Swiss-Prot record:
One of its GO terms (biological process) is translation. This is Large ribosomal subunit protein bL9. GO terms for cellular component: ribonucleoprotein complex; ribosome. The keyword Nucleotide-binding does not apply. Belongs to the bacterial ribosomal protein bL9 family. GO terms for molecular function: rRNA binding; structural constituent of ribosome. InterPro entries: Ribosomal_bL9 (IPR000244), Ribosomal_bL9/RNase_H1_N (IPR009027), Ribosomal_bL9_bac/chp (IPR020594), Ribosomal_bL9_C (IPR020069), Ribosomal_bL9_C_sf (IPR036791), Ribosomal_bL9_N (IPR020070), Ribosomal_bL9_N_sf (IPR036935).
Length: 147
């Protein structure tokens, strides 16, 4: 029997998936718990329409992210911070700091998408990568100067 899952069901599938299960499992477990609905012709058409809409949204979001990455690729983010005599910072430049600075520049980047080779603890030029998905990344420069 074909059903459309309304909630995630372990070892069966995820929300919105069209799956084939035994009739007894559907009638005795899935339907009473409102975990699935029978896949009637109307529901299948609705399911397919929702899948197309979701796919279009996903493509649009990926295109927008790629455009944003193209804008920030090669950008230099400058920090003016206090440092000791040996050019060691009194603190660290974190991904949160970089995200906030990019926000000031008009680019909305989540801190979890920014990857540093190593923590920034000294003055100078450093590199960071903004990575959304495999193959979708932009390289930015981090300049740390004495305040």
């Amino acid at each position: 029997m074909k059903v459309i899952l309304q909630k995630d069901v372990k070892d069966v599938g995820r929300v919105g998936e069209l799956v084939n299960v035994s009739e007894g499992f559907a009638r005795n477990f899935l339907f009473p718990r409102k975990l699935a609905a029978e896949a009637t012709e109307k529901r299948v058409k609705e399911y397919e329409h929702l899948q197309r809409v979701a796919e279009a949204k996903k493509k649009k979001a990926l295109a927008e992210r790629q455009e944003l990455l193209n804008k920030i690729n090669g950008t230099t983010v400058t920090f003016k911070l206090a440092a000791g005599d040996t050019d060691k910072l009194f603190g660290t430049v974190t991904t949160t700091d970089i995200s906030k600075e990019l926000q000031k520049m008009g680019h909305s980047i989540d801190r979890r998408d920014i990857h540093l080779e190593e923590p920034i603890k000294v003055l100078g030029q450093h590199k960071a990568v903004v990575r959304y998905a495999e193959g979708m990344e932009a390289k930015i420069q981090i300049a740390v100067e004495r305040a």
